[in-house]
């Protein structure tokens, strides 16, 4: 099957879960799963097809509160049964998360799906991958830098801000603007 799938939204509310609070807590606890958020929001029109084997209960078990999703974009191009992420991101009041990769419906597999918490320049701060079959996906641990240096992450951010010319490999450069 070939085609396109699109989901866009503004000023959405997710009741029962404070995403910004959980992401802030992540910096000190390292206990958060970006893939939960990515799969829930970004798969959009394709989500119900691929998430049968995925348990979202962990996303809603511990938080309370609510999240304001300022902007959501989920644009996918489908060729030969593989949906490739195009402009796939969302921004809350304080954070921006983006997704890359594909959903292989022919082989029922995640194709190099990567979810990242990104800064204002589109540079990844935390990266997490999802691999394997739709029925039993494997969520890899967050990138090594953040896992090892989690409690020091705030210091690294402050140091980087002192040298604004620092370079990064841009993960996302799409339509979803960073939080103000």
Stretches found by the model and what they are:
Residues 1-180:
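Extended terminal
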């Amino acid at each position: 099957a070939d085609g396109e799938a699109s989901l866009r939204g503004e000023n959405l509310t997710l009741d029962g879960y404070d995403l910004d609070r959980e992401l802030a807590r992540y910096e000190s606890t390292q206990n958060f799963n970006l893939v939960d958020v990515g799969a829930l929001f970004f798969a959009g029109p394709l989500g119900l097809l691929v998430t049968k084997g995925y348990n979202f209960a962990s996303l809603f078990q511990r938080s309370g509160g609510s999240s304001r999703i300022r902007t959501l974009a989920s644009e996918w191009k489908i060729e030969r049964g593989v949906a490739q992420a195009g402009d796939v991101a969302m921004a809350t009041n304080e954070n921006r998360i983006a997704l890359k990769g594909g959903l292989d419906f022919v082989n029922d597999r995640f194709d190099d799906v990567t979810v990242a918490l990104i800064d204002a320049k589109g540079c990844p701060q935390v990266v997490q991958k999802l691999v394997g079959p739709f029925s039993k996906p494997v969520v890899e641990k967050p990138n090594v830098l953040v896992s090892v240096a989690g409690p020091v992450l705030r210091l690294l951010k402050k140091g980087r801000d002192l040298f604004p010319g620092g370079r990064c490999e841009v993960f996302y450069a799409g339509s979803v603007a960073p939080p103000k």
